[in-house]
C-alpha cells in the first residue's frame, strides 16, 4: 500500500493552483475548491485521495513485474520525470513523442535494436573498418536514437500503464494508449479533460515544485511495489527449499542389502581352505571304516 499523502505538503508545493477561470474544462468542476483572483483552486483533499488511489494501483502493477511508461515532454517536467523514472527503474519519454510509439511498437523496437547493433559494431571492430564519412553518419544516427529512444531501450514489450504529466500536451500518447486499452495515470490540471484518463491526480502540472511532489510520490509507490515483489520471490524460494528438505527427510531410507561374501583370492587363504577340506574328507573316511569294523565284530 502506498504511503499516506500529507495535504500540507501538497499545499506547500503549490499543487492547488489551477489555470485561469476562462481556460477551465467544466469536467474538472468536481475537483475545484474555489476561485481566487481569476484562478481556480484545486481541492487538495480530493487530490490527496486520488494520489493514494493511483499510488496503490501503480504499486500493484510494479509488483506484478510489468513496466510503467512515464511521459512528460514539457520543459519544467523533463529532468524531474527522468530522474524519478530512473529511480523506479522504469522507461520514460521526455523528448518528442515518437509517432506510433505504442501502436507501431514493432518498428520502434527495430530502431532500438539498430542502436544495439551499432554498439556491437564498435565492440567487435567492424566500426573501424568503415570510411570516415560512414563512421560520422553512424555516430549521428546513434546519437539521435539515443536521444529519442535511449530511455526505453529496456522496454521489450508494451507497457502495462502510462503515467503522464499534462494530458493536453501529450494528447497523441493518450490516443495511442486508448487504442490499445492501456490504463492511463496522469496529473490533470483544471484546463484538461479528466475523462481521458483512468486514474487522475487533480494537480498543478505547470510548476516544477508541484510536478516534483506528485511524480516523486508516484515513483516511491512503484519502488514499494518492486520491493514487495522481491520479498515475495525470496519467501517463495525459501518455502520451496524447505519443502524439498522436508520431502527428502520423509522419504524411506533404502535398506542396504548384505553382499555375499566373496571367496578370498589370497594364495595362503586358498591353501588353508584346501587343507581344511582334506581334513574333513579324511575324518569322514576314518569314521566310515570304524563303523564298518564295529558292525563286523557284532556279527
Curated annotation (Swiss-Prot):
One Gene Ontology BP term is:
translation
Q: What GO terms are given for molecular function?
A: structural constituent of ribosome
Q: Give the Gene3D superfamilies listed for this entry.
A: Glucose-6-phosphate isomerase like protein, domain 1 (3.40.50.10490), Helix hairpin bin (1.10.287.610)
| UniProt entry tagged with the keyword Hydrolase | no
Q: Which domain of life is it from?
A: Bacteria
A single cellular component GO annotation: cytosolic small ribosomal subunit
InterPro entries in UniProt: Ribosomal_uS2, Ribosomal_uS2_bac/mit/plastid, Ribosomal_uS2_CS, Ribosomal_uS2_flav_dom_sf
Instruction: Give the residue ranges for region: Disordered.
Output: 227-299
Write down a Pfam family by its short name.
Ribosomal_S2
UniProt keyword list: Ribonucleoprotein, Ribosomal protein
Q: Which NCBIfam families match?
A: rpsB_bact
What family does the database annotate? Belongs to the universal ribosomal protein uS2 family.
- Identify this protein by name: Small ribosomal subunit protein uS2
